[in-house]
């Protein structure tokens, strides 16, 4: 019988999409895959190639909430016991965690049974759960050449494999960027959770662009449900063609069409922009844990692939000026596209799968 890997991820698309890409790579090599996730992660798992899903108890709490931390500890302990029972039945050859509190019970359960373990950090800053697990697991993989908040020992042994992306996005690495000639296509994405700031600010900024530029624009706007109608109204009044939706499932298709992307700088967003070779304006989420989105954005900015606007400095006028400066210079967009692609690691899923196979028993 083929070997089985448990992939533990959940919480957001930022954890789930790389986990799915690894699962697909392992499945293509003949592995069986079981997904350990939570209710939120299940929302992104409709195409996850898993023969079974484990819903393990998991919880988190703020460090300044002692009672909440105690309660969360008991919930995690319950999840660990659930994981141990499931692993005794499944006997996985390896357990792979993608960070976030939903992955913790599975990894602790595996460690308590002496099973091979691998963790992957998607961001340029080692997350809290992975920070705890890193000294204890067999192998640490990471997406970026910098890994803030990691100890020197962890940094020294970490494998820089990149962030796994799904095959449709990986295919864009081989598609050349075509600078705009007539129509200007802009994709606005707030990440898998949407972004109120972008839902409301970007349409207003677009409305301030010169009439000639607005007449050439087509905007694909991801917006929160409560902001969609207002966004459509602003675009309509500005005579801008638009497509507004709460979530774009075919992200590869929209990336392929777009000349410029505006979005947050979560790990998946930055990785997909690099692999697709798309220029971008990035707005790091100010409240992101350990300011990890700013570190993610910096890597694309230093490669020449992105312009970065900090939330505290962002206004409608600032965004309008940034849009005008980029959309009026196709040659600059082409140069940024090349810069973004220079930061890509398109074979991350295969490299991580190699590491997982090497670690498995």
Swiss-Prot record:
Which positions bind UDP-N-acetyl-alpha-D-glucosamine? 12-14, 123, 166, 192, 293
- What are the record's GO terms for cellular component? plasma membrane
Instruction: State if Cell inner membrane is listed as a keyword.
Output: yes
EC number of the protein: 2.4.1.227
Gene Ontology biological process: carbohydrate metabolic process; cell division; cell wall organization; lipid glycosylation; peptidoglycan biosynthetic process; regulation of cell shape
Q: Which GO terms describe its molecular function?
A: UDP-N-acetyl-D-glucosamine:N-acetylmuramoyl-L-alanyl-D-glutamyl-meso-2,6-diaminopimelyl-D-alanyl-D-alanine-diphosphoundecaprenol 4-beta-N-acetylglucosaminlytransferase activity; undecaprenyldiphospho-muramoylpentapeptide beta-N-acetylglucosaminyltransferase activity
Reactions this protein catalyses? di-trans,octa-cis-undecaprenyl diphospho-N-acetyl-alpha-D-muramoyl-L-alanyl-D-glutamyl-meso-2,6-diaminopimeloyl-D-alanyl-D-alanine + UDP-N-acetyl-alpha-D-glucosamine = di-trans,octa-cis-undecaprenyl diphospho-[N-acetyl-alpha-D-glucosaminyl-(1->4)]-N-acetyl-alpha-D-muramoyl-L-alanyl-D-glutamyl-meso-2,6-diaminopimeloyl-D-alanyl-D-alanine + UDP + H(+)
Q: In terms of one coarse class, where is the protein primarily found?
A: membrane
Name where it's found: Cell inner membrane
Sorted alphabetically, which CDD domains does this protein's record hold? GT28_MurG
Region forming the signal peptide: none
Q: How does it sit in the membrane?
A: Peripheral membrane protein
Q: Which UniProt keywords are given for this protein, alphabetically ordered?
A: Cell cycle, Cell division, Cell inner membrane, Cell membrane, Cell shape, Cell wall biogenesis/degradation, Glycosyltransferase, Membrane, Peptidoglycan synthesis, Transferase
Uppermost EC category: transferase
Keyword Ribonucleoprotein in record: no
Recorded hits in Pfam families, A to Z, give: Glyco_tran_28_C (PF04101), Glyco_transf_28 (PF03033)
The record's comment on protein family reads: Belongs to the glycosyltransferase 28 family. MurG subfamily.
Q: What does this protein do?
A: Cell wall formation. Catalyzes the transfer of a GlcNAc subunit on undecaprenyl-pyrophosphoryl-MurNAc-pentapeptide (lipid intermediate I) to form undecaprenyl-pyrophosphoryl-MurNAc-(pentapeptide)GlcNAc (lipid intermediate II).
Query: Which protein is depicted?
Result: UDP-N-acetylglucosamine--N-acetylmuramyl-(pentapeptide) pyrophosphoryl-undecaprenol N-acetylglucosamine transferase
Q: Which organism is it from?
A: Caulobacter vibrioides (strain NA1000 / CB15N)
């Amino acid at each position: 019988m083929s070997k089985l890997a448990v992939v533990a991820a959940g919480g957001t698309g930022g954890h789930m999409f790389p986990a799915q890409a690894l699962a697909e790579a392992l499945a293509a090599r003949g592995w069986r895959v079981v997904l350990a996730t939570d209710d939120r992660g299940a929302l992104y798992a409709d195409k996850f190639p898993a023969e079974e899903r484990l819903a393990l108890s998991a919880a988190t709490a703020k460090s300044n909430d002692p009672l909440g931390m105690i309660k969360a500890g008991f919930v995690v302990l319950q999840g660990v016991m659930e994981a141990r029972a499931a692993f005794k039945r499944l006997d996985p050859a390896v357990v792979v965690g993608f960070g976030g509190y939903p992955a913790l019970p599975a990894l602790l359960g595996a460690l308590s049974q002496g099973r091979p373990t691998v963790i992957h950090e998607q961001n340029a800053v080692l997350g809290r759960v992975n920070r705890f697990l890193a000294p204890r697991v067999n192998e640490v993989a990471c997406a970026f050449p910098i890994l803030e908040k990691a100890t020197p020992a962890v940094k020294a042994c970490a494998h820089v494999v990149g962030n796994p992306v799904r095959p449709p996005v990986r295919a864009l690495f081989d598609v050349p960027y075509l600078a705009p000639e007539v129509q200007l296509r802009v994709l606005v994405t707030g990440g898998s959770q949407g972004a109120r700031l972008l839902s409301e600010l970007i349409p207003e900024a677009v409305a301030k662009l010169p009439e000639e530029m607005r007449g050439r624009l087509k905007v694909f706007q991801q917006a929160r449900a409560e902001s969609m109608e207002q966004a459509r109204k602003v675009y309509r009044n500005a005579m801008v063609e638009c497509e507004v939706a709460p979530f774009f499932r075919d992200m590869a298709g929209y990336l392929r069409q777009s000349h410029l992307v505006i979005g947050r700088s979560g790990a998946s967003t930055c990785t997909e922009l690099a692999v697709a070779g798309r220029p971008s304006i990035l707005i790091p989420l100010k409240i992101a844990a350990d300011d990890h989105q700013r570190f993610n954005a910096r890597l694309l900015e230093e490669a020449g692939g992105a312009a970065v606007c900090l939330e505290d400095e962002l206004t409608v006028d600032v965004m309008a000026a940034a849009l005008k400066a980029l959309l009026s210079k196709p040659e600059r967009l082409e140069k940024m596209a090349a810069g973004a692609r220079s930061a890509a690691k398109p074979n991350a899923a295969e490299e991580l799968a190699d590491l997982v196979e090497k670690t498995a028993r």
